[in-house]
Amino acid sequence: MQIKHLITLFFLVLIGADQCSAFFSLIPSLIGGLVFAIKGRKKREVSPQIDQYRNFQKREAELEELLDRLPMY
C-alpha cells in the first residue's frame, strides 16, 4: 500500500473510533432518560404553586390599585 492510502485509512479509523466513543458516552444518558420516562416524573409539591398564585393575586390587586390612582386624561 502506498503512504497516502495508509494515511487515509488511519484517518477513517480515527473518525470511526471518535464516533463510536461519542455514541458510547451517550448510552448512559439515554438509559437514564428511559428510566426517568418509565418511572414517571416526581409529583410536584402543591404548596409552592399555591404561594405563587397568592403572590400573583397580590401583585394584580396592587396593579389595579395603582391604575385606579392614575388620573384620567
UniProtKB/Swiss-Prot annotation:
Its main location: secreted. Transmembrane segments: none annotated. It is found in: Secreted. Residues 1-22 form the signal peptide. Keywords: Antibiotic, Antimicrobial, Cleavage on pair of basic residues, Secreted, Signal. The keyword Ribosomal protein does not apply. One of its GO terms (biological process) is defense response to bacterium. Belongs to the non-disulfide-bridged peptide (NDBP) superfamily. Short antimicrobial peptide (group 4) family. Antibacterial peptide. This is Putative antimicrobial peptide clone 5.
